[in-house]
Amino acid sequence: MFPYPSGAGLHVGHVRNFTIVDVLTRFYTQQQMNVLRPFGYDTFGLPAENYAIKTGISPQSATETNIHNFRKQLKRLGYAIDWSREINTSNPDYYRWTQWCFLQLYKKGLAYRKESYQWWCPVDQTVLANEQVENGHCWRCGTEVEKKKMKQWFFKITDYADELLADIDQLDWPDKIKTMQRNWIGRSEGAEIDFEVVDSKDFIKVFTTRPDTIFGATFLVLAPEHPLVSKLVNDDTKQKVDQYRTETLKKSEIERQENKEKTGVFTGSYAINPGTGEKIPIWVSDYVLMGYGEGAIMAVPAHDERDFEFANKFNLPVKQVIEKPEGSTDSDECYHGEGELINSGHFNGTRTEDAREQIVAWLHEQGIGEQKVTYRMRDWLISRQRYWGCPIPIAYDEDGNEYPIPEDQLPVIIPEVEDYKPDNTGRSALAKATDWLTFEMEVEDKKTGKKVKKTLTRETDTLDGYACSSWYLWRYVSPHDDKSAWNQEAISYWAPTDIYVGADHAVAHLLYIRFWCKFFADQGLLPFREPVKTLLYNGYINAPDGKKMSKSKGNVIDPLDVIDQGYGADTLRTYEMFIGPYDMDAAWDPKSVGGVYRFLNRCWNLCFGEERALASDSEGNLATTGASATSSPVTTGRARSVARGTEDKDRLCIRNKTIKKVTDDIHRHNFNTAVSATMEYVNELYKTGAEKEDLVTLAKLLKPFAPHLACEMLEKLDSDDVWPVWDEKYLVADTVELVVQVNGKLRAKITVSVDDLEDQEKIEKLALAEKNVQAFTKDGIKKVIYVKKAKLLNLVA
């Protein structure tokens, strides 16, 4: 429950997510549990800053307006939110503690600064976020962008890579989310090998998962950004390599990894293959990424598809070093499987599975290789050259030395500025706040170690918004605490989070909160190592045509429009739970909304004897509203005063079965079938007439989905809202329905006692007493098939 409060407000797709949480909140509250259901806003980010640049309206002002609109929508939807715990990441009382979290990571060496490439617009003279680059051009001015090296802040999430990966197995999360996190972390075991550069003192470090194939390495490929590239070129190759590097820096990593024709440039230099002692050429190509391993690969085209394609393109040698096993059906030109080594010196004949360890040991003896584990996941880049973000609590002296802001001087407040555009060096608009930018602070001099007063310059980068949302779950337990980020007694009582409902950021936010949880557990500040016990990953509500709702497409449906049309909040909430399994995408269907409205009217009519008229057009839109007096099954003869006996027992069976069904369905998060079971119960009450206890049960079962209607009913019935409990003895009915077939076709359904199921002769007599069965068995019965478990009697005539 931590949305970004956009100017567009909520649409009906958001309502599904929030209603799931509300259904569970009300359900467990009715079961008399203590339920924490707070709400907050993830308010930092580009949209508010871009809006400020465009309109001059400050992000602070625009954010407050948007939050007011969100709050209004949420209250209209009837959510049981504890508004006393409302939080907002751009409130200084909140981001004070985000800055404190940063400093804890900084103290332990897990927040650090290094150079990194960023998108840069040479005309606007500013850094661009990935989403601001459109087909290689600046979204504002259309200029072709380039990559520029800048100092950036990172969190060392890779220090926790092994634990983050290992603990995925214990999570009660959807398999697809766990798989995405495993793949994102991307643990690879292999070897790091040094390749000596010919006529140079340099070595190129290469990571490979297949050290057993080293004798088949016929060339090396470096990422164009590799720091050694500039030293490997010569006068003949420098221009081509520089041009290729420039073109590569315009591409995203996704574009570089797409299956397409390989490109590359020869550097002019060679390396020595430590296995064969042969000279092999060194190339650069964009299919090698700087972030994986060491940004360099040994290419074995006989046994790797991408290397094979590259070798074919540039006529490079292919050397087979694994013999394909006899009977292998692998028809690929390059063999990827296991087998015996060939053309591999004294390792010939060794199985590849054994050779990996033996070859690494051999390389280690020579001092040019060792076992290594690497990860696809990189350290988390957390600095942004934006105004509207949490200021990083770091300052610098004139020599560039870093000084953390003392905790008792937090928060570092975001200053008001007149111009929200970044300055012409790519720094954020914070750099223009000169009164804020420089200040005096007593620090320990880096050279002398003495306490001195220095004039310092504040960091003008701000934190990635994900930093603010990496700890909000713990702030909820004590949102007004001004002594700590979270109260230890409260965190022990309320956390970790039992149920988290969300549909995005599987490998961003959901990974980052796990990282921070483990870090703060190591500091003794959290009594658990995983932040969320159960994750529900809900599907989207799409537009009626199946397309995703978005403001740009003009297909957004405002929940308040649905409510004000006459359907009301209860209809909208119940429809969104009834539309299908919560984890599946669904298309908005106006006609079905009308159906749910009619169902709730039937519930009203059962209790109050008054059903609001509904006339709808072909699209399900309300044509008229109002009320038409109809008789209630409670207040007329339809609510028969039932004599004690079988009919009472049947009523109790139906009621208790419904209670169990709805309870189990909500526990299993099958919200759609819980609503369906309630609908079936209403149908039964219309058939039999409803007694007070039936209506009390109905109102209690309805309350998580349609709280407004349910509360009206419970007040009328003078009842509490405690969740009903079924009685096991009423789950088995005294009577059952038995199907009678003649020659395999349905001819009758008869009601028999459970005891009579044991008496086939009696069952046959009851069946033959049915006129329709008699009509089809005039010529006699040749054979009788009775299946007791299936409650089926088939007469062969």
Question: What spans do the regions from the language model cover?
Answer:
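NTP-handling and nucleic-acid-processing catalytic cores
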Residues: V12, T98-V318, E323, P422-F439, ...
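N-terminal catalytic cores of NTP/NDP-binding nucleotidyl/phosphoryl-transfer enzymes
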Residues: M1-I57, I87-C101, T208-T209, P274-F310, ...
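Helix-rich, typically C-terminal accessory recognition domains appended to large enzymatic cores
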Residues: D42, K107-K108, Y112-C121, R187, ...
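Conserved phosphate/anionic-ligand binding catalytic regions in large, soluble enzymes, centered on
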Residues: I204-H226, W380, R386-P393, D461-W474, ...
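Basic, alpha-helical terminal appendages of large translation-related enzymes
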Residues: A223-H226, K238, L316-E333, E357, ...
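Intrinsic disorder/low-complexity segments
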Residues: S200-K201, G609-K649, C653
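Alpha-helical recognition segments enriched in aromatics with Gly/Pro capping
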Residues: S269-G275, K279-Y292, V321, D435-E440, ...
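Residue patterns forming the tRNA-binding/recognition surfaces of aminoacyl-tRNA synthetases
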Residues: I53-P211, P227, A296-Q409, E418-Y420, ...
